[in-house]
Amino acid sequence: MKKLSILFFLMIVGVVSSAQILKPVSWAYKAKRISKTEAVVQIRATIDQGWHIYSQHLAPGGPDATVFTFAPSKDFALNGKTTEPKPTTYFDKSYKMNISYFENQVVFQQKIKLNKATAAVKGKVTFMVCDDTQCLPAEDVNFSIPVK
């Protein structure tokens, strides 16, 4: 009976603690061919209401910018830098600087030059997400995007 009580307690603690894990950003990926040797990789962040992630282009001394890191491959080469749409920008009194961010949804794009008919674009995105009262620690999310 004592073992059963302990097991039940641990199950309840597990359910309660998992309910407190915040994941306000979900990521989706796809690749779109634009020619026989070129493609655009699209990396979409869907952001919960009230939360935001930061632009790739922030001055040092502010919050953590979003960063894309692509694994080297013989199957493709990056063509330029990862692009983003125009962010919302405001002056932050705490940081004493302009801060650029995205709410709701944002699609980042990376052009690639293909060296083979198919490829897998692998890498990670590092981002920080905040709402009006808190920021979560920067998080790494790995991805692998097939290009067919």
Enumerate the language-model features and the residues they cover.
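Positively charged n-region of N-terminal signal peptides that target proteins for export
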Residues: 1-5
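N-terminal hydrophobic alpha-helix used for membrane targeting or insertion
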Residues: 7-9, 38-39
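Hydrophobic h-region of N-terminal signal peptides that target proteins for export
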Residues: 10-18
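Extracellular/lumen-exposed scaffold segments
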Residues: 18-148
